[in-house]
Amino acid sequence: MTYKETPVTYIFLILNILVWIAIEALGSSSNPETLRNLGAITYVDIRSGQYWRYLSAIFLHIGIMHLLVNSISLFILGSLLERTLGSYKFIIVYIASGIGGSALSYSMISPWSVGAGASGAIFG
């Protein structure tokens, strides 16, 4: 699969990797406070009306393994879905699924947990 065939998948992959590198430079992707400061989902923040976190959390990953597993999954499934739906519809499905996954994550986390990752966006 080439960039020409599935450009959005590649863009999301690059974006996730660049965001992870930035998080590591600013603190640590394993540090809950760093993740919270950069847009991860927390019970308190969502309850205070910070709904933008449902979107921002899609691009944050907790540790290198989380990033690697989601990147491999995105490459395989995202490429397949983007070729099937087309780039524009793929963006809509990816973002909508990610926001839905973030909302589901929020509904199940404890008040002291931090939620992040693209799993909801990838797996719908």
Question: Over which residues does each language-model region extend?
Answer:
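Hydrophobic core segments of transmembrane alpha-helices in multi-pass, intramembrane catalytic enzymes
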Residues: N70, F123-G124
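N-terminal, membrane-interfacial amphipathic/helix-forming hydrophobic leader that caps
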Residues: M1-T2
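N-terminal TM1-TM2 helical hairpin plus the immediately adjacent luminal interfacial "cap"
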Residues: E5-A118
